[in-house]
């Protein structure tokens, strides 16, 4: 490393399924961080990303191109992308040479959207593990489209994917419900927003699914999935609207607390600022009501909501 550069670096590994808003998140978060005075370096780790809206400090496309891999090896998009990540894993010296001059920056890693990379394939986890050896402290920021909350079956699937990702990636982890301004675009929520963000008693979700003739036949399967999720008791969500600065601030406070940035000495924070960052990461539950009033249309209570209050 360069002599006077700080040895420890911090950042976010932005992961999530395709279309969840990872690239938009990197753009919005980088602008917010620069407004706070942090030096930011956005790193594109997705070889399929084209026409990036942000200024890219490092682009994996300079090392390996998805189109070239697909043509040369006759692979499809998914297989080609997996090969690209394995190629990056085998050439981490290239990545380190790109990152070393950026010490002192706060990193945002825009990762590929293929779910298998975060649930069972080893390349991305190995890359993150090696970054930890370089004294780069990352928080995994997992984005999930908030409109999945309107479909109980999809929400259970999201919970399973989020849990599998948390266990596989092996990083401090934050789950986000992205695009909060569009949460009811495809339907109404069956319960209050805090039911989904805090992942409360999922038996109510099973009862709601039982009213559907199709899912009634899969009740035992859903019960086992719910039991697995509740046994681990790891998954929760923070609502995010990337256009809302207060929403971004809540996310950043949680991320900073997870990777230890708010307790670092690099910015010489005052004690008051440190306490604000440390404690602020825990108040998203109390702010959920305000978020619900802001983004969800008012409606009469459903039977499920009344049951939740008993």
Curated annotation (Swiss-Prot):
Say which family it is in. Belongs to the GPN-loop GTPase family.
Q: How does it assemble?
A: Heterodimers with GPN1 or GPN3. Binds to RNA polymerase II (RNAPII).
Residues marked Stabilizes the phosphate intermediate (site):
78
Listed GO cellular component terms?
cytoplasm
- Nucleotide-binding found in the keyword field: yes
Highest taxon above the source species? Eukaryota
Sites where N-acetylalanine occurs are at 2
Q: Cross-referenced CDD domains, in alphabetical order? A: GPN2
The UniProt annotation puts motif Gly-Pro-Asn (GPN)-loop at: 76-78
Q: Does the keyword Protein biosynthesis apply?
A: no
By its UniProt entry, which Gene3D superfamilies does this protein fall under? Answer: P-loop containing nucleotide triphosphate hydrolases
- Sum up the protein's function in the record's words: Small GTPase required for proper localization of RNA polymerase II and III (RNAPII and RNAPIII). May act at an RNAP assembly step prior to nuclear import.
- Chain positions recorded as GTP binding sites: 19-24, 178-181
This protein's UniProt keywords = Acetylation, GTP-binding, Hydrolase, Nucleotide-binding
Protein name per its UniProtKB record: GPN-loop GTPase 2
**MF-aspect GO terms:** GTP binding; GTPase activity
